[in-house]
Amino acid sequence: MVHYRNRYLNYIRRKPLALLAPITLLVVIYFYFFSAHGFSSNKQKYNYNKKSRGWFYKNRDTVILKDLPKNHISHYDLNKLTASKDALNKREEVLILTPMSKFLPEYWENINKLTYDHSLISLGFIFPRTTQGDDALKELENALKKTKREKRLNFKKITILRQDSNSLQSQLEKDRHAFKVQKERRSMMALARNSLVFSTILPSTSWVLWLDADIVETPVTLIQDLTGHNKPVVSANVHQRFINQDTKQPDIRPYDFNNWVESEEGLKLAASLPDDEIIVEGYSEMVTHRALMAHFYDPKGDPSTEMTLDGVGGGAVMVKADVHRDGAMFPSFPFYHLIETEGFAKMAKRLGYEVYGLPNYLVFHYNE
């Protein structure tokens, strides 16, 4: 019998399993935790084969997948998604988007009167991080609760966002429409619109309706009417009700001057401006002589009459969702000397889409 002076060697010789057991355990632990990383260079980055239900993998998979549904990979075939003139009969989904700095009950009631199937309509709102924005958000939440209590809240989905960008502190009409703040204001609005649309659009969305929070009266068939034109971008004509001081009678007047057709004067003005300057329509400080759709309204005309446009406002604009998916957004920077909704129209046209307006189809803006 061989006897070593070192008592540890003698112990190992008598009981070899005392050493082999911990070494084996360490090897198993090493391969369990580190083998995937050690040999990753010889494997594909992603492996979609179902993992073994062996002892080593069972617990790890359970931890990772316990909160996921069984079929946690969703497949969408957008080639089958339609945006047609027969939207309602084809059950096409509509996303109504509204940047909101103040809440008007008339806006909310008008939305709820729309006759398009509410189960096919999703709503999206974005609020500025201001005191007015806080107040508007609370009022909308109260309106939602009231409508729900009355069992009239049947929309597919409602998303409410808060801006992570700046906004004007004052939302009074005279302040937000002042010429000197237009570039800053509309740049902020563009950021808000982009956040809203790209946070809420779904694979099932066929149409996006941009509806300003100040639009308080539309035909109840607004969605059917606009989608019925089957255009990539189509804008209603925004007017405003008021009391005519001359006749002392209720009257209407043009309101949104951002729906326009480009002019030679407008092109010359753009060519004379520095790259970072924008043209703002509807102000005496910048005369463009563009044809404004607001002035083309004919009370006796056909509401379905169309005209091609080069710029649009944001009052009531129906957009095929694929226009946004293809990259048309609201530039927060001068884009061919245009910004926000007018810049969006330019971008859509640069992508190959046509933009239309309906001069005899009226929606009405709130009168402050």
Curated annotation (Swiss-Prot):
Positions on the Lumenal side per record topology: 34-368
Coarse class of the protein's main subcellular location: Golgi
Transmembrane stretches, start-end: 16-33
Membrane topology: Single-pass type II membrane protein
InterPro entries given in the database record: Mannan_Polymerase_Subunit, Nucleotide-diphossugar_trans
Topological region Cytoplasmic: 1-15
Keyword entries, A-Z: Golgi apparatus, Membrane, Signal-anchor, Transmembrane, Transmembrane helix
Record-level GO cellular component terms: cis-Golgi network; mannan polymerase complex; mannan polymerase II complex
Lineage: superkingdom: Eukaryota
Subcellular location: Golgi apparatus membrane
Pfam families xref list: Anp1
One GO MF term attached to the UniProt entry: mannosyltransferase activity
Gene Ontology biological-process entries: cell wall mannoprotein biosynthetic process; cellular response to heat; filamentous growth; filamentous growth of a population of unicellular organisms in response to biotic stimulus; filamentous growth of a population of unicellular organisms in response to heat; fungal-type cell wall organization; protein N-linked glycosylation; protein N-linked glycosylation via asparagine
Pathway note: Protein modification; protein glycosylation
Family in the record: Belongs to the ANP1/MMN9/VAN1 family.
Role, per record: Required for the addition of the long alpha 1,6-mannose backbone of N-linked glycans on cell wall and periplasmic proteins.
Record-given protein name: Mannan polymerase complex subunit MNN9
Originating species: Candida albicans (strain SC5314 / ATCC MYA-2876) (Yeast)
Gene, per the UniProt record: MNN9
